[in-house]
Amino acid sequence: MRLTHPFITRSHDLNGLFKNVKTLSQFMKRLEKQSKMFPERYPVEKYLGDGWEFFCEALIKSHPCDNRIGISEYVPVTKNDNGVDGYGVNIFGEVCAVQPKYRSNTKGLLTSTTDKLDSFITEALLEKNIQPSKQYRHFVFTTAKGLHHYTDHEKYRGKVKCFGYDEIRSLVDNNLHFWNFIRGEVLQFEEKVLSLKGNKK
């Protein structure tokens, strides 16, 4: 298995989340529906965020040689989340930070303060001792439209590449290779669980 985000073990119905899904909007509808199933056990916002992080891990790992993304060696951060949800290596061979942000409003824009992106770059620089670079090297993946102009150009100074709703749609909508990649990972996980249960009998 290549996907390691804990959501793969915590989701309410991982198979149901991806079965016959072909578009980003279909995935979002199912994720939002599942998020309301057991809110006392798994808070809605937490479920949406974790599900989106899992999706983004799949997106990144299924496009390592595609220079539109070009992130390799990606590892999700599952503890001490202070603004960075994962690290990888970008197309320039540099360590890069990744921040997925799920938003139900696909027309909205992310801002550094409202959407808690203030610590993103700072945390990346400190945690991995990343040196400043002339080219963009960090990534935000969001179901919102994108970054607010001020956040993009003044706060991040063009060093963060944001994949918004429309850009992600162009990568995954009706892309059966991508959706089958995720379903294959889900199937492997389910087979592993069944195997472990069988060994305990």
Short names for language-model regions:
Residues 1-55, 192-200:
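Interdomain/boundary linker segments immediately adjacent to catalytic/signaling cores
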Residues 7, 17-24, 110, 161, ...:
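Intrinsic-disorder-associated interaction segments
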Residues 34-37, 123, 127, 174, ...:
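Surface-exposed polar/charged interaction patches
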Residues 46-132, 148-152:
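Catalytic centers of nucleases
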Residues 94, 133-137, 157-158:
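Short glycine-/polar-rich loops that comprise or flank the Walker A/P-loop
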Residues 98, 139-141, 161-163:
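Hydrophobic/aromatic beta-strand patches that form the interior of the parallel beta-sheet core
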Residues 131-147:
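Acidic beta-strand-to-loop metal/phosphate-binding motif
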Residues 151-193:
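Charged, structured surface patches that assemble and position nucleic-acid processing machinery
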